Every structure is written in structure tokens, then in C-alpha cells.
Amino acid sequence: MVPESSSGPREGVRITSEIGPLETVLCHTPGPELGVVTPSNRESYLFNDLLDQDKAARQHGRMRAILERFAEVYEISDLLEEVFDVPEARRYLLEHRPDVTGEKSPDLAPEEWVRVFIEGEESSGGTLASLLNEAGYTLPPLPNLFFLRDPAVVIGDRVVVAAMQHEVRWTEEVILRALFSHHPLLSNGGILYDGADERRMNTSIEGGDVHVLREDVVAVGMSERTSAAGIDTLRRALFSRTDVTELLVVLMPRHRTSIHLDMIFTMVDRELACAYAPYFRGPKRLPTLHLRASEEGVREKADLFEALGDVGMDLSPIYCGGGGRTVQEREQWASGCNLFAVEPGTALAYDRNEHTLSAMEEAGFRAVDGVEFLTGDTEIGGDERAVITFEGSELVRGGGGPRCMTLPVRRGPVAW
């Protein structure tokens, strides 16, 4: 976390864009919970591969150090430990995970409760389970927690607690609900939707699919993780309780390479977005539905960029992987589209996607090595566009990039 000013850390949430100057962001450094993922269960835990905990933590630490040059950065585990000292928050957390908490004293130290909630609690099992060396969990660990984008979204000064598609991530919803309800740093105008408590059949919403593009414009991917029913629920809440008047729904393929909208599209400047070309031009382009608060019905557009033009956001694409299809596929798989903007025209990206970085340079960005940026060997000019790179060879094996690993809760305004 950056040093506090004399007035203390910023409190309260507000997100009105994907690119506004970052002020406060939440992260989770991957830890021992990664050790539960094995070749036989990796798909159940939603992983593409097995991660080395130490390497993943080091690479995540480099990303966090870069973020700290721009904003206050908070570890989710630190905030969770603090809310466990709030009686109402502790009661909520324990009531929502009774299988394991019923076996422990409610007076357990906050840091021990944090360990249980994040690293899980292994079941003692019975005679047969012990004999066969088969481990089970009364509370499953959360190896996906470092992809903190998914369990919650801030829209304006309101919060959406996700309704995660897969049960292995449901505890993440409970944690984020407790934090946004009880931590003063995250004070807000109310919960728009509470996926931890309001779960309904076929209703799912995940943060990787929700992009606050402007104060009045939200784009959502209808994907394998975010359902039509979830989007309908979100639409009603947005149009009745926020300043959002335009909702753009991208009809996504049900495919592992594009589980969320942010795997194929991220905004990096006022008029630029990094995008996966096959889904935005040619025969496989993804239709986008435009819903407006002021009218009934739905308008269908050829793709998201066309729909954005209708709401006065004329974005140009920077194509992930450049112009060659094979390289586009390889770099999209390696989270080449999954950038995270810290201010207009400055974004974080993995260093491995060289053709994507070249495409960004052609669009006016300078590729800046993250280590050189941190040591001061390379500086970024005030009006200069830059993409700051860091090594993500281990992190990417989990299936996400910088946007996936960050939950911004406060950004400054954008001068459009």
C-alpha cells in the first residue's frame, strides 16, 4: 500500500470507467491454497495447469509493486482479518459457512479464520478415507481467489456481489459481501445484487464479464460464466438504481478461451481497446445487444465496437497478436487481451505477448519494462501512452491476466 497521506487512506468506492486514474485497488497474492490443485482435479478447480506457488507469488508481487506506484493497494486477506474483528461481520461469515465453522470455536483468532476461509479446512474423514489416503474438505480452499476481478464489481458507488457459476468459488462471494458490508474502506451506496444470498436457478454474474466503460455505459459478456438471467437481473438494478442508461450485451461463445469478456476485450484509453480480432471482424464476429433505460426492446448490432459508436464511444481496436491468425490465437490464450488500465493511456500487461505489444506500439504506446520502471531507469512522461510489462509465465497458467487479478474499487474521473 502506498504511504497514507495526512488525511488517511481514501474511503468509499466509486468506479465510472475502465480507465480513470486508479486510486484504490484490491488484490490477493496467491499462496498455499494453490497446493490443492492436482492433475486429476485441476478442471474441477477451473485451472488450465498447475502453478508453482513461489513463482506465482513473486510474479504477482511484481505486478503489485507496479500498481503501488499509481494507487493504494490492499490485500484481501488483510481486509478480511480486520472485518473478523467486527462482531456482525464475523457472525455473517460464520453463519454462511456452518459446515466448518461449527467445528471450531467462534473465538478463533481473526488470522486463523482467514487461513481457514482461504486455504480451506481439510476433513478428518473416516477409517476408509484414511486407509485410501483420500483427502476431503469441509471448506474447500480458494485457489482462484487471486483472480479477484470475478467475485464482485463496483458500478458507480454501488456494488454487485457476483453469483459465481461454479461452486468452488462460492466462498469468494461470501468474503466480498462481508468486506463491502463492513469494512470502512469499502463504504458504498448499497449492494445492487447479492449473489452470496440471492442465488437463483440459472442466474450467474461474474466480474470478468462486467465492464464499466463510462458513467452511463456498461458492457457485459453473456458467457459460460454469466447467464442471460443474470444479465436481466443486473439490467433491472442498473436502470433503476444507478446512472447507467446503456447496457451492451456481447453474445460470447461457450469456450474455455473466452470464459469472460475481458479475455477478448479491454479498454486501454479513451478511444482505444485491445481486442481479439476473430470475434470483432469477419464471419465469427460476436453480435451485441443494445438495451436502453429509456426504451423497450433490444437493438442488435454487428459487434461491440458498432454498439459503442451508437452511444458516442468511437473506440478503435488494437488487435491482440497483431495481424496473423496463429499468433492471435496463441497470445489471446496467454491473456494478451487482458490488460489493466491504471489511467487513460497507461496499462499493465504480461511481457510474453510480444506481437500484442508491437501492435500497441503501432497504436502509440511505449512498451516499458516493469523492472526498469520500478528502479527508475525508465520513466513515463505525463502525456505519454505506455504499456508496463511484467513477467507472468506462471500466473498465466491459471487462465488470466492483469485485469483478472485486480479489483478496482475507486478511480478518478475521466475527461472525455
Please describe what each predicted stretch is:
Residues 2-416:
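The feature marks the mature, well-folded catalytic cores of soluble enzymes
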